[in-house]
Amino acid sequence: MKRRAKELGADLVGIASAETLNAFPPDPRWPQTPERISPYCKSVIVIAQRIPAGAFRCKSNTPVQYIDMLVLRKMDKVAYRLAEELEAAGHASLITASQETEWALKRASYGRLSTRHLGVEAGLGTLGLEVNILTPEFGPRVYLTGLVTELELEPDARITEQVCIGESCSRCLHSCPADAVLHFGIDKRACATEAQEFGFGSMLGMFDGLIDGKTDAATLFRSRDFFGFWQGLLRVVGSFGDCPRCLAVCPVGNDYHAHLAEVQKVIPEKTPEHVALGKQYKADRATHDAGEGPEIAGLNDWNRRWVGVEGYQGIVARQLQEFKRQQKERAEAEPE
């Protein structure tokens, strides 16, 4: 099944057990579980599609927005075709459209399934400091979706080593223009001001202004904001994924080593306050791991399974060494 998904175009594929996903919802208050979708689900096939690194070498964020749209379209097509093939073989299946959310789940701030947590349970990566999923191959520069199936498949093992370098890196924290990166958590409202420039909240703001009479309709309809809203409806461009900074600067993944290490080395947004906060997180982590100090919500007993129960053990350093070795071998193999 995983081989077939890759033949169809998936970059990464993993299998998660529906039973495990039902037992460990990311937020038990708002359970994002397969059983809420179908009581007959046995497995979830998790598909990840990489975002081409070239998008993070551009002068503005606009190319990332367009690439995101294309990546999502490709990924949904891969998952849909796989679901069709499963049904043709006698196994009822359906896909959960990537990035969809449900109003009943915390006013649509959650999807029916958390694709990040699906990826962790399917052995594709672990959550980072900013709670994006970090895959060893592509870091956080991926989108994921889930295919819910009644076929019982052997689940993949979770990665127990923390893929994220963590507090001693803090590059995502340093780069965030909204100061939204918490300690293995995210301030969603702050993040949305940059990541969802033309999202649902901005749309409500536009129409509130019209209803209250505070906004001139003719001016609004000829504004960049209204154009962004229209484009978001057509292509999801601007409605999410606007701000790629935490993705661009993360040093995890061979795509970073190959294409981004030089251009993303310097972080213009980095401030003394960012550095101080990263150091505070590091100190808090040390006391937390020693069983002292206040609890860190993102590292409590429930959430630790998705961060990596073993902590960071140097996976990025090992990966970089292997990348350099392969580069050297390729260079030596090339004819002069």
Annotate each language-model stretch with its function:
Residues M1-M75:
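Non-catalytic, usually N-terminal nucleic-acid engagement modules in DNA/RNA processing proteins
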Residues Q65, L70-T271:
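Catalytic cores of enzyme domains
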Residues F240, H274-A276, G311:
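Conserved SAM/AdoMet-binding glycine-rich loop
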Residues V263-Q264, P268-V275, R325-E336:
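Compact disulfide-stabilized, cysteine-rich extracellular microdomains and processed peptide cores
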Residues P268-L277, D284-P294, G298:
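Short, C-terminally biased terminal segments at protein or domain edges
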Residues T287-K328:
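Long, compositionally biased charged/polar accessory segments in the mid-to-C-terminal portions
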